[in-house]
Amino acid sequence: TVIRPFNVIGVGQNPDFIVPKLVSHFKENKKEIHLGNINTSRDYIDVYASCELIKDLITAEKSFGQIVNLCGGTGHSVAELIEVLQQIYGYKIKVITDPKFVRKNEVWRLTGSVDKLESCLGKQVPKMDLHEVLSEM
């Protein structure tokens, strides 16, 4: 089985990535953040859910010899992440678009299909609670 993980997020993630960068700014009560394009959308999946799904996949006979996306099937924009963090921390942060963070060939939307994952496991992949995952970080 080949597992194609999408954007795994959660406790212990490298602070150089966008989600922990956002969380740390809110935790530190910073008033502004310099970012690139906040309208790009990515398929995030919780690290704990990822571990459970991998455990299930390695024992699922239907997954043998398959290439399977490890994803949630739903895209979330950076703007959406910021909105949820503003709800969690109770304040609005000023977003400054910084050209050094804007990618020339940005992929606007990157979302995986859960169809094969669900087929291999014989069950529906639970939807991630973005509020809960960000709160735990």
What annotation goes with each model-predicted range?
Residues 27-137:
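C-terminal substrate-binding subdomain of Rossmann-fold SDR/epimerase-dehydratase oxidoreductases
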Residues 11-17:
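Short beta-loop-alpha junction of Rossmann-like oxidoreductase domains
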Residues 1, 24-28:
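Active-site Tyr-X1-5-Lys
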Residues 7-10, 24, 40:
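Active-site micro-motifs of SAM-dependent methyltransferase domains
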